[in-house]
UniProtKB/Swiss-Prot annotation:
Modification type Phosphotyrosine: residues: 268
Motif mapping: TXY: 266-268
Effect of residue 134 to R: Abolishes CAM4-dependent activity
Species in which this protein is naturally found: Arabidopsis thaliana
This protein's UniProt keywords: ATP-binding, Kinase, Nucleotide-binding, Phosphoprotein, Serine/threonine-protein kinase, Transferase
Region of interest (Disordered), residue spans: 18-56, 474-589
Record-annotated Protein kinase domain positions: 104-395
GO biological processes: response to hydrogen peroxide; response to jasmonic acid; response to reactive oxygen species; response to wounding
The name this protein goes by in its record: Mitogen-activated protein kinase 8
Positions contributing to ATP binding: 110-118, 133
Amino acid sequence: MGGGGNLVDGVRRWLFQRPSSSSSSSSSNNNNNNHEQPIFNSSSFSSSSNPNHSANSGELIIEEDLDFSGLTLINVPKRNHLPMDPHKKGETEFFTEYGEANRYQIQEVVGKGSYGVVASAVDSHTGERVAIKKINDVFEHVSDATRILREIKLLRLLRHPDVVEIKHIMLPPSRREFRDIYVVFELMESDLHQVIKANDDLTPEHYQFFLYQLLRGLKYVHAANVFHRDLKPKNILANADCKLKICDFGLARVSFNDAPTAIFWTDYVATRWYRAPELCGSFFSKYTPAIDIWSVGCIFAEMLLGKPLFPGKNVVHQLDLMTDFLGTPPPESISRIRNEKARRYLSSMRKKQPVPFSHKFPKADPLALRLLERLLAFDPKDRASAEDALADPYFSGLSNSEREPTTQPISKLEFDFERKKLVKDDVRELIYREILEYHPQMLEEYLRGGDQLSFMYPSGVDRFKRQFAHLEENQGKPGAAGGGRSTALHRHHASLPRERVPAPNGETAEESSDVERRAAAAVASTLESEEADNGGGYSARNLMKSASISGSKCIGVQSKTDKEDTIAEEEDNETVAELTDKVASLHNS
């Protein structure tokens, strides 16, 4: 999609999240007067209850007219389509047993990886395009299954236009023996990482619009006492109409302490380039929602620069880049750092003066830079909250509190499983209970103590399996309609619901059965040669395995530049001790 022309109805749709609408549906042109700033003719934020969801997770619907004709459409990578075999069209009919006959009309495989398969489809009830992700062997590893449970639960509870939405989860055939799950999502076209790479002509209005959506979504998430903990451009889904949605809540956590702004989790492994300074070297024993605000600041700076702001090679290099730009922190900030060796490291650092933001971003709006300074404050207590940032003068004429709702903190009972040691059967039962939230009749029977649900409400998953198997078998065949490849090779990093691991041209299902083993070996070999000097703890399995249901990394055919970016940035499993002795000394208090 080209980057020129007036923004049309699709641009308005970000504020028209009605149940039957799709932010990825095609838009039609109309003639609007051009405005440099969006104009709101009316404002109302309503909440409607969805019968498939709990009462405390009402869907937010914005009902207002927005003229954003000053924006242009953004470029997003296009897919090559793999049309269905006309002789196999009948296999698209499924879910007849549970009253869902023909609801989802499968169109094409848009993603494939060790986790399973993603197919695009059309919901015949609403007409919107959706993505259906089949996750294989959910319970192979309890840790992965727990992460999936956490994300399914959070995405059910966090119902907001700026957070990716689960539309439906398919009923498994057996309560106690199922292994795979099928999750239906709204279909998004790309992610912010790809948008930044593909568009060198973004306007100040684009930047403002993007940041507004991120902060509005984050305000809602933080009001629920949820910390995302891994915000980065690849975890922000995007459409050509400029709509953004936050995804990948697999690392998110909910705070239940009496003081919800002071939390500590020992398993935190955020992507380094977007990691707040208090997380580098375990500087703070406690951290706050300000960790997400820092990440948003880094993302906003990347939009303005067209490249990452702090592309550190390791933790120490990351700190050096931060202090080179922001200056060394003042003594009062250093004094609040609990790690003694970290305090000594920063105290002994040569005095650095901050670089004026106007020098780093000479073409940026001064109001944007003043807000960016508030987002990138070194000391977390000095960072603006999402709510405060939305009230910044930068959003004058755009921000409206009635369109920026808050919510109640999530109940502690929802995440009681986090405090228990779970086995596979425990997680399976908890995920099954979450699936029933999308099947209200069965949920009612379940809550009454019914134990024969699969006999009362038969599952359509078996038919769905055959449908996915057919798609996988025909994906990439030389004679298949569409030219043998269903995904574009240049799509290397993706968040659901887009392609992950495109199979080589001409590869059959049998030939691709060992794709994970071969790709993992190739990645391991590449990393061994390119990371020899660093001794990094980069895991090939972790690159291939997608534990997140709404966003994940992938291995694809990468250019040298993209491969180096991935290796440098995506070392999510690094521990400080794996880098250098210097960093290890910071880690050990």
